[in-house]
């Protein structure tokens, strides 16, 4: 009986579906044609070989589907166990909060979650390419030197199988190959399906807008001559493409890119396209003939920067790996199931609540269980959309990009002094170290070393941090540090380069990165120092924290037997025994442990380090963003209003969700006081220091001790909490920029438009009504307030006195009297004098 008859009988007997039969018929015909036309086999032999290959491929597909089904089922059982064992702050079973804990950090469980796993996977990838990151990291303003660009081109040639003879380019290419292969294996380990391909090289970044500008045929005609068809495999049959099938395949690729995946959307389903475990096959599909072909395509339809392409690949893969690890091979299906389970349990609890048989402790007395659960479900759905990336996409692209660019420019004009506020990180790092039973000085001492290394050519400590699995945020992104103050995810690259220039130039980027690396290495160094001790002999606070993250006596006994890493092995400038670390990834490399144990212990330890680092250097979180902004997207009126209101307010919100939350979780009033009182006092003192430094940088003398009253210390407390601009209202009805409380609360974007309208239409209105205008003064103030880089803390005063004051003298006829009035106001309000008075070319 022929194989076709077997397929027909299979359908009749109900063993396979019509859809499965159709796929097998198509594969059988394609294989038969290939062996007849390309291999010259006889009709009988071609049918036999095609039948066998179709059968084998069908069996492989069935095995893969079975693996996927088992992994998906196991993941659902795992999450169901989390639902049953999780306890909220009141010690109650709580399905909704249990599932939310898998999306973002939860202070009551410390479960590995998508947000933290993304960071962990990025760190693992960066670890394998420390030297590449060191050589190719962006300079100030997202700039790349001519040498970097030349070396990147040589590296691309090596990746595409060309021999350049450049040893360094070969080493960089090998580092990227190792990193990309690591990501592929991690993706597959958690249920993905990415086949290995020799000389794969690099993924492609497709700019949807650029691809849409040409027709499908024009795009295919452009890319087809650049592709190495022999290296491209038809995923369905496993055979090389012919002239017909390659155009059909490229047609699908075009539709996928131009519609952002919507071409495969089926109405009535919860998602579109392939399940995540299959989706990553696409970026390996296109195989270019040469490095020149790849670079020409990227220049025309993507990104011509290979380094950016690599970093975006790492970020995207890390996100997808995290989704697979936490939610299984089909996250959409898992999410739908989980929400269904939460709703089911909510209905049961709500019915019991109505009968008086169920009562939950809650802050809002008259809120029933169904209302509470629905609120959390809404939050969860938004978190899931955030992790998938759908919340980052502007609804109206032009509107969204315009306002994103404006926020970047405002950042470059207004955050030049934020580095001064970042000195409070030393305080947060100290109290986090103490809470975790670590030496309180160690992280801050390391941070100073990293800061000192920043002005040296040798970056040995930085490379060591990256090799230890700590993320190289400062080295791999442009304007990445602004996440501490903005909710910005994407913006036009030119605007990000401007803000990056200021953020790096001010030192904020380096201070933030140094603090994170320093704390992470402090933890690993302490664990190395303590590795000779059994669990019961560890510091009580360290024991307590490790147990919270799922590391007890049994786990510690395995972890502490891991071979310690001495950084002198890789860095000649580090003395032997000077930097010794217990690195989580070295646990993963142990041959004496099974896969599950290695993965479990490595994840738990990295989750501990990564999460506590975000306490040591408070950084914005997905939970914080979603709690405040909800489902608001860029490119909508609602989204842009919310982004404006929240601009620069991320840091205090983060403090509230980390340290303040942790303080209130401590047992009893004594426990709460032990955490919160030192936190507030230390934060206030650091806030006062930051405030006085900024006063001196603005040309003012420090505040006289006799003027340091209640208002002063309240202002210092507000400064320490990252809301310095609101502290101004303790002394005046305007902030330091002349804005009202309402304008400050509305955010910088609203203030910008308000000032722009006042400068233009406001002055025209005054002129037409015969009122006196202050157009010159307002224009000078507008230029000073909104010029990128004008408020860098170490150049601001020179710019103000020599350039801005001179400009205002020309534009404002009342400059002298206005200046005298401002000096008198300052003296009356705070008792301060200027050491470099406004309007003077030289200091007093």
PLM features: what roles do these ranges have?
Residues 419-490, 494, 639-843:
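Small-residue-rich, membrane-active alpha-helical segments
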Residues 1-638, 816, 820-844:
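Non-transmembrane, interaction-prone alpha-helical and coil segments associated with secretion
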């Amino acid at each position: 009986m022929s194989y076709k008859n077997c397929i027909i009988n299979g359908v009749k007997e109900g063993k396979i579906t019509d859809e499965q039969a159709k796929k097998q018929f198509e594969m059988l015909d394609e294989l038969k044609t290939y062996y007849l036309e390309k291999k010259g086999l006889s009709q009988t032999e071609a049918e036999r070989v095609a039948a066998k290959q179709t059968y084998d491929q069908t069996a492989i597909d069935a095995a893969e589907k079975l693996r996927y089904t088992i992994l998906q089922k196991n993941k659902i059982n795992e999450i169901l166990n989390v639902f049953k064992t999780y306890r909220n702050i009141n010690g109650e079973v709580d399905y909704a909060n249990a599932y939310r804990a898998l999306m973002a950090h939860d202070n009551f469980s410390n479960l590995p979650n998508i947000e933290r796993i993304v960071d962990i996977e990025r760190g693992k990838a960066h670890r394998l390419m420390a030297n590449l990151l060191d050589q190719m990291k962006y300079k100030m303003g997202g700039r790349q030197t001519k040498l970097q660009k030349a070396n990147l081109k040589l590296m691309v040639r090596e990746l595409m199988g060309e021999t350049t003879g450049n040893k360094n380019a070969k080493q960089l290419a090998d580092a990227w190959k190792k990193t990309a292969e690591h990501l592929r294996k991690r993706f597959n380990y958690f249920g993905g399906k990415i086949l290995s391909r020799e000389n794969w090289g690099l993924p492609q970044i497709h700019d949807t807008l650029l691809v849409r500008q040409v027709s499908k045929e024009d795009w295919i005609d452009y890319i087809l001559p650049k592709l190495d068809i022999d290296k491209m495999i038809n995923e369905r049959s496993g055979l090389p493409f012919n002239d017909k099938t390659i155009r059909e395949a490229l047609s699908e690729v075009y539709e996928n890119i131009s519609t952002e995946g919507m071409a495969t959307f089926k109405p009535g389903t919860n998602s579109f396209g392939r399940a995540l475990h299959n989706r990553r096959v696409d970026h390996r599909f296109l195989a270019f003939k040469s490095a020149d072909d790849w670079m020409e395509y990227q220049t025309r339809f993507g990104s011509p920067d290979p380094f950016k392409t690599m970093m975006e690949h790492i970020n995207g893969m890390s996100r997808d790996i995290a989704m697979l690890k936490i939610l299984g091979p089909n996250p959409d299906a898992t999410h739908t199931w989980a929400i269904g389970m939460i709703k089911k349990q909510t209905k049961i609890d709500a019915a019991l609540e109505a009968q008086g048989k169920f009562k939950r402790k809650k802050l809002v007395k008259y809120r029933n269980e169904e209302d509470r659960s629905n609120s959390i479900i809404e939050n969860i759905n938004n978190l899931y959309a955030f992790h998938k990336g759908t919340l980052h996409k502007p609804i109206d692209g032009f509107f969204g990009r315009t306002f994103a660019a404006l926020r970047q420019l405002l950042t470059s004009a207004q955050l030049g002094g934020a580095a001064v506020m970042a000195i409070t990180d030393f305080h947060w790092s100290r109290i986090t170290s103490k809470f975790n039973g670590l030496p309180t000085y160690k992280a801050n001492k390391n941070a100073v070393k990293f800061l000192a290394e920043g002005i040296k050519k040798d970056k040995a400590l930085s490379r060591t941090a990256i090799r230890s699995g700590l993320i190289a945020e400062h080295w791999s992104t442009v304007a990445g540090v602004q996440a501490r103050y903005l909710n910005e995810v994407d913006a036009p690259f030119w605007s990000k380069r401007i803000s990056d220039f200021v953020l790096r130039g001010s030192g904020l980027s380096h201070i933030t990165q140094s603090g994170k690396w320093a704390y992470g290495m402090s933890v690993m160094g302490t664990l190395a120092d303590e590795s000779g001790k059994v669990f019961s002999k560890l510091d009580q606070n360290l024991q307590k924290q490790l147990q919270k993250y799922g590391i007890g006596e049994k786990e510690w006994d395995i972890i502490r037997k891991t071979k310690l890493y001495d950084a002198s092995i890789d860095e000649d400038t580090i003395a032997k025994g000077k930097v010794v670390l217990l690195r989580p990834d070295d646990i993963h490399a142990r041959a004496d442990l099974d896969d599950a144990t290695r993965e479990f212990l490595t994840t738990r330890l990295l989750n501990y380090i990564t999460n506590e680092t975000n306490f040591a250097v408070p950084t914005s979180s997905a939970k914080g963003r979603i709690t405040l902004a909800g489902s608001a997207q860029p490119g909508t009126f609602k989204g842009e209003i919310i982004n404006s209101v929240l601009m620069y307010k991320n840091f205090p919100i983060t403090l509230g969700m980390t340290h303040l939350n942790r303080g209130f979780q401590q047992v009893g009033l004594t426990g709460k006081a032990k955490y919160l009182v030192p936190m507030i006092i230390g934060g206030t003192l650091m806030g006062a220091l930051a405030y006085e430094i900024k006063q001196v940088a603005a040309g003012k003398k420090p505040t006289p001790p006799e003027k340091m009253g209640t208002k002063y210390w309240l202002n210092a407390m507000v400064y320490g909490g990252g809301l310095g601009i609101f502290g101004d209202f303790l002394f005046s009805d305007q902030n330091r920029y002349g804005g009202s409380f309402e304008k400050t609360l509305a955010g910088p974007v609203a203030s910008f438009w308000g000032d722009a309208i006042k400068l233009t239409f406001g002055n025209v209105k005054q002129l037409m009504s015969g009122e006196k205008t202050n157009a010159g003064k307002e224009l000078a103030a507008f230029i000073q307030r909104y010029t990128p880089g004008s408020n860098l803390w170490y150049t601001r005063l020179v710019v103000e006195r020599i350039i801005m004051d001179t400009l205002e003298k020309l534009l404002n006829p009342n400059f002298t009297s206005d200046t005298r009035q401002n000096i008198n106001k300052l003296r009356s309000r705070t008792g301060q004098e200027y050491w470099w008075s406004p309007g003077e070319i030289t200091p007093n």
